[in-house]
C-alpha cells in the first residue's frame, strides 16, 4: 500500500492519495491523528467534497475527520468494467475497511465513527458489520432503498441486529 500526504490540516482542494488494489483513491482529512476518527462517506453521484463543511467543524471538536472518494467517484480512479467488474457495496465497504486498516490504524487505535449519506450509509453499515469491534457508531441518513430490498434476508437481519446498539437514528 502507498500513502501520499500533502498536508495534515487539509484543504479540500489539495487532497491526499492512497493506492488501494492498484487504484488511486482520493481523500481529505482535518484534525489531529490521535483524536476520535470519523469517516464521512458520500452518496451516489457525489464525492468527498460533499462533506467539505463538516471536516473542520468536527476537527475543532477533538476529531480526526476523514472523507474519501469511493472508487468510481470524485477524484478517485474510475476503473472500467474490465479492470474491476461491477462496482458495488461489497467493493466499497472493503475499500473503507482497508482505509481504516492502512491509513488510520498506523496512527490511531480508537474506534471509528462512520457517517454516511445515501449510498455512503449502506457502505458504512456494511463496513460496520465487517469491523464490528473497531466501529464506535454509525450515523446513516438517509438509507438507500437497497436496505428495504434486503429486509427478507435472514443473514442481513442477524448481522445488523447485533450492531443495532451502535446505530444512531436521525
Residue ranges with predicted function:
Residues 31-37:
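Proline/glycine-enriched tight loop/beta-turn segments at coil->beta junctions
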Residues 45-53, 65:
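Serine-hydrolase catalytic-loop signature spanning alpha/beta hydrolases and amidase-signature enzymes
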Residues 138-170:
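Helix-rich cap/lid subdomain of alpha/beta-hydrolase
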Residues 106-150:
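Conserved hydrolase catalytic core segment
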Residues 8, 14-28, 60, 64-115:
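Active-site loop/oxyanion-hole signature of alpha/beta-hydrolase fold enzymes
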Residues 35, 43-46, 118:
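Active-site glycine-rich loops that stabilize anionic/oxyanionic intermediates
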Residues 45, 70-74, 145:
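Alpha/beta-hydrolase active-site loop signature
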